[in-house]
A protein has these predicted regions:
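Asp-based phosphoryl-transfer active-site loop
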Residues: 30-32
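Short catalytic/ligand-binding loop motif for oxyanion handling, primarily in non-cytosolic enzymes
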Residues: 88-91
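Catalytic metal-binding/acid-base residues of hydrolase active sites
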Residues: 35, 85-86, 158, 184
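A short alpha/beta connector and helix-capping loop motif
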Residues: 25-27, 41-72, 76-79
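Short amphipathic alpha-helical segments
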Residues: 42-44, 93-94, 165-168
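Short acidic, Gly/Ser-rich segments with clustered Asp/Glu that frequently serve as metal-coordination loops
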Residues: 35-41
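Active-site-adjacent betaalpha module
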Residues: 1-28, 70-75, 97-224
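Short beta-strand segments at enzyme active-site cores
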Residues: 77-84, 180
Length: 224
């Protein structure tokens, strides 16, 4: 375990340990790639073949994300955001994969900003990344350790790429991960569901209302 040890260590083979409920003061919410360059009216019109994805974002991911942000902020949960954004204006610092794929959001560009519906508050943390997994190209692990985080809740897009990569890496680094299933999305429901099955050994999987209920119990217990 990391130096911020979780109190009750698991017995060998006790898979129920990853189902532990996140705890106040040791939990963060991470939002992945909900950025203007990937979700905007121009792109929606230009890519009608991704109609399912646009609908999933508009009707499920964004409204559920708003509910979750409200609950987390009210409970004092640390909120972090990560989007694809270069450290340079010309993109020379991008990963090879992003160069080959043509993924390019320059430093300080509007396209690299979080969408307005879920935008960070002034004192919340935004970490630009240049890889699928935020843990590969940033100092997010260092930041989470400094914040005393042991439980990491994850939402965002796309489920079977950057979200999945973050879940796997966070688990391998010793965080207890909760994937917010109905605050994530990808190009098809089939791809989304297949990913949930593939990574169930790396995380708890919960819906937004379940997590909000858990957070509500924290506040109730704190008030008693």
């Amino acid at each position: 375990m990391n130096r911020h040890e979780i109190d009750a260590l698991p017995l060998e083979g006790d898979v129920s340990f990853r189902e532990r409920t996140p705890e106040p003061g040791r939990t963060a919410l991470l939002l992945i790639d909900l950025q203007k360059g990937e979700y905007n009216e121009k792109k929606i019109k230009a890519e009608p073949q991704h109609a399912y994805f646009w609908d999933r974002l508009a009707k499920t991911v964004i409204p559920n994300g708003q509910k979750l942000l409200t609950a987390c902020r009210a409970a004092g949960v640390e909120v972090l955001f990560t989007n694809v954004e270069c450290y340079t204006l010309d993109g020379r610092d991008r990963s090879l994969d992003y160069k080959v794929s043509g993924i390019f959001f320059p430093k300080g560009s509007k396209d690299a900003e979080v969408i307005d519906e879920l935008k960070p508050l002034p004192n919340e943390i935004f970490i630009p990344k240049m890889s699928s997994s935020v843990f590969m190209s940033t100092n997010i692990e260092y930041v989470l350790r400094n914040l005393g985080i042991e439980y990491l809740m994850i939402m965002g897009v796309v489920t079977d790429q950057c979200v999945e990569s973050a879940v796997r890496d966070a688990c391998d680094l010793g965080f207890l991960v909760t994937l917010i299933e109905d605050a994530c999305g990808t190009m098809t429901q089939e791809r989304h569901d297949a990913t949930l099955r593939a990574i169930k050994g790396y995380c708890r999987q919960r819906k937004v209302e379940q997590v909000i209920e858990e957070i509500g119990r924290w506040r109730k217990e704190a008030a008693e």
